[in-house]
């Protein structure tokens, strides 16, 4: 277990930098991941994906498959990669505070 501190707030993360506790997610976490992923600004499109991922996780306890993410947000995979350069799993799920996906997200 590792710890990341950003703007005075500490987060426990796994070996890949994902939050250990979903309930620790907060705006400071988003800012931290945004900077570490090299994303300049969080747009409404970013927020739409984050909100969907969080809602899906709260209901199902897992991250959605990519096709479910695409179908429900209206974004093609290419567009998700444009928003989150490291992809839907590493970038989007991490920013949304989800644990590291085990499947194909």
From Swiss-Prot:
Catalytic reaction(s) noted: [DsrC protein]-trisulfide + NAD(+) + 3 H2O = [DsrC protein]-dithiol + sulfite + NADH + 3 H(+)
GO cellular component: cytoplasm
Alphabetical GO biological process terms: tRNA wobble position uridine thiolation
First-tier enzyme category under EC: oxidoreductase
Signal peptide: none
Enzyme Commission code(s) on record: 1.8.1.22
Alphabetical UniProt keywords: Cytoplasm, Oxidoreductase
Subcellular location, record wording: Cytoplasm
Keyword Amino-acid biosynthesis included in the entry's annotation: no
Alphabetical list of InterPro entries matching this protein: DsrC-like_C, DsrC-like_dom_sf, DsrC-like_N, DsrC/TusE
Highest taxon in the source lineage: Bacteria
GO MF terms, alphabetically ordered: dissimilatory sulfite reductase (NADH) activity; sulfur carrier activity
NCBIfam families reported in the protein's UniProt record: dsrC_tusE_dsvC (TIGR03342)
Family: Belongs to the DsrC/TusE family.
Subunit structure, as described in the record: Heterohexamer of two alpha, two beta and two gamma subunits.
Primary role: Catalyzes the reduction of sulfite to sulfide. This is the terminal oxidation reaction in sulfate respiration, a process catalyzed by the sulfate-reducing bacteria.
Protein name: Sulfite reductase, dissimilatory-type subunit gamma
């Amino acid at each position: 277990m590792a710890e990341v501190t950003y703007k005075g707030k500490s987060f426990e993360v796994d070996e890949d930098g994902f939050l250990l506790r979903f309930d620790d997610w907060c705006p400071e976490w988003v800012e931290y991941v945004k900077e570490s992923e090299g994303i300049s600004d969080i747009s409404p499109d970013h927020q739409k994906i984050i909100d969907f991922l969080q809602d899906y996780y709260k209901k199902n306890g897992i991250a959605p498959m990519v096709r479910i993410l695409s179908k429900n947000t209206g974004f093609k995979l290419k567009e998700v990669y444009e928003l989150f350069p490291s992809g839907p799993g590493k970038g989007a799920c991490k920013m949304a505070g989800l644990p590291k996906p085990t499947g194909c997200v």
